[in-house]
UniProtKB/Swiss-Prot annotation:
Residues 18-37 bind DNA. Residues 1-58 form the HTH lysR-type domain. One of its GO terms (cellular component) is protein-DNA complex. Required for the induction of a regulon of hydrogen peroxide inducible genes such as catalase and glutathione-reductase. It comes from the Bacteria. It comes from Haemophilus influenzae (strain ATCC 51907 / DSM 11121 / KW20 / Rd). GO terms for molecular function: DNA binding; DNA-binding transcription factor activity. InterPro entries: LysR_subst-bd, Tscrpt_reg_HTH_LysR, WH-like_DNA-bd_sf, WH_DNA-bd_sf. This is Hydrogen peroxide-inducible genes activator. GO terms for biological process: regulation of DNA-templated transcription. Belongs to the LysR transcriptional regulatory family.
């Protein structure tokens, strides 16, 4: 048994498909399948129930996968400790971002990170929160920029900024001329929402339900841009995060209205694994991103 075998096993548990797991490990499917069988022979247990349709792990297999994840995390920590000797801001940095933040934050922070930390080789990944946290847990990501939710409490959270949510309405909507609105005005309104898996959906719904609004049950969007286009078509109203509204003031068809009592918002944070020897690296990146966002938002006031 070696570290590579454990990586094959964990990849198979994530993809539940031999070819996709092999592709993720940059090996052929026969190689991965053969190593899994050798691992079973070495341990004297059956790890998988192999069917023509899907891969199922036995109870023993699931226990071994959990332990393999732990071993791989510790191996990554050892490598980080070795590479961290005098090279805190040097080397690869794998950052994940959620889809409701990434497209609007990256154009600002990518050039900033290159200028501030020229020796960092930054790799960027976009996925929903639960996927990012899984990859963070397994060590595939070093850190992630997400909206704080209960699931992020298992990690170290470094708040970057507090992001307002603005009410987006069609320019033909009766509220289009309002400069601001109290949240109780939403009582009885139907709101367009993102589909399941987006943390913004749950955060927006909490504010909506408290105000007496409800979700439009006939439509769910996969992206903020779809929501924006639906609003422009006067097909409904929704909440949009502040960064997604930057430079959108001149777009025809949509008006953005601040709300109050309470002001809807969410906290965007950089999260990383507890115990990481590269803590200072992540804290410095978080601080730099926070300063950049603050300067952007202050410039709009």
């Amino acid at each position: 048994m070696n570290i590579r075998d454990l990586e094959y096993l964990v990849a198979l548990s994530e993809y539940k498909h031999f070819r996709r797991a092999a592709d993720s490990c940059n090996v052929s499917q026969p190689t991965l399948s053969g190593q899994i069988r050798k691992l079973e022979d070495e341990l004297g247990i059956i790890l998988l129930e192999r069917t023509s349709r899907k891969v199922l792990f036995t109870q023993s297999g699931m226990l071994l996968v959990d332990q393999a994840r732990t071993v791989l995390r510790e191996v990554k920590l050892l490598k980080e400790m070795a590479s961290n000797q005098g090279k805190e801001m040097t080397g690869p940095l794998h950052i994940g971002l959620i889809p409701t933040v990434g497209p609007y934050l990256l154009p600002y922070i990518v050039p900033m990170l290159k200028a501030a930390f020229p020796d960092l080789e930054v790799f960027l990944y976009e996925a929903q929160t639960h996927q990012l946290l899984e990859q963070l847990e397994t060590g595939r990501l070093d850190c992630a920029i997400v909206a704080t939710v209960p699931e992020t409490e298992a990690f170290i959270e470094v708040p970057i900024f507090n992001e307002k949510m603005l009410l987006a309405v069609s320019e033909h909507h009766p509220w289009a001329q309002e400069s601001k609105l109290p949240m109780n005005q939403l009582n009885g309104q139907e709101m367009l929402m993102l589909d399941d898996g987006h943390c913004l959906r749950n955060q927006a719904l909490d504010y909506c339900f408290t105000a007496g609004a409800k979700e439009n049950s006939h439509f769910q969007a996969t992206s903020l841009e779809t929501l924006r286009n639906m609003v422009a078509a006067n097909a409904g109203i929704t909440f949009m995060p502040e960064l997604a509204v930057l430079n959108e003031g001149t777009r025809k068809g949509v008006k953005y209205i601040p709300c109050y009592s309470p002001e809807p918002s969410r906290t965007i944070a950089l999260v990383y694994r507890p115990g990481s020897p590269l803590r200072n690296r992540y804290e410095r990146v978080a601080s730099a991103v926070s300063d950049e966002v603050k300067s952007i938002l202050d410039g709009l006031k």
